[in-house]
Amino acid sequence: MSKTDWNASGLSRPSPSAHWPSRKLWQHGQKYQTTQDRSEPPAGKRRQAVRVSANHASQQLDQLKAVHLASAVRDLERAMTTLKLWESPQEISRHQALGYSVIMFMITAVKRLRESKMLTLSWFNQALMVIAPYQEETMNLKTAMWILANLIPRDMLSLTGDLLPSLWGSGLLMLKLQKEGRSTSS
């Protein structure tokens, strides 16, 4: 087949169906490479490109979640400050005698989230060991962490460490703990 076939657009133009040889030199024993072979990238490279873009999308999603978490923590901090201001003077003097209230534990946890962005089980267990002799403070800490776990949107909990995801949705457990706390304190 000649490279200059007759076609409707003119005599001297090459036919689109004619395949031009590649610029790469052909060696003995090598398969001739068609234009179809050259246009498709190898399968391994295609998968790698998809993997990179999926990884990039995952990173962007994590960054977006981190921004939303920072916004949620700022909102919680403002809400905790407002709650602290709304407490009556009798409640404040009572809490100073006993120690930390639920609101004060929540304020502490939100500050820790803002500064280190993590609330871990080890931190929680250390806090429980410090306040172990005080039953009411122990219950206040557990209640504060449970409330915090339920206030932060669930899809962002994984960014806060391992404490809040483990407490999320454990409402029946909290009710049981509160009943135990009331029965032992009375």
UniProtKB/Swiss-Prot annotation:
The keyword Nucleotide-binding does not apply. It comes from the Viruses. Its main location: host cell. Disulfide bonds: none annotated. Pfam families: Paramyxo_NS_C. InterPro entries: Paramyxovir_NSC. Residues 1-44 are annotated as: Disordered. Residues 1-15 have a biased composition (Polar residues). Keywords: Host cytoplasmic vesicle, Host nucleus. One of its GO terms (cellular component) is host cell nucleus. It is found in: Host nucleus; Host cytoplasmic vesicle. Ribonucleocapsid-associated protein that interacts with the phosphoprotein (P), thereby increasing replication accuracy and processivity of the polymerase complex. Interacts with the phosphoprotein (via C-terminus); this interaction allows C to associate with the ribonucleocapsid. Belongs to the morbillivirus protein C family. This is Protein C. It comes from Measles virus (strain Edmonston-AIK-C vaccine) (MeV). The gene is P/V/C.
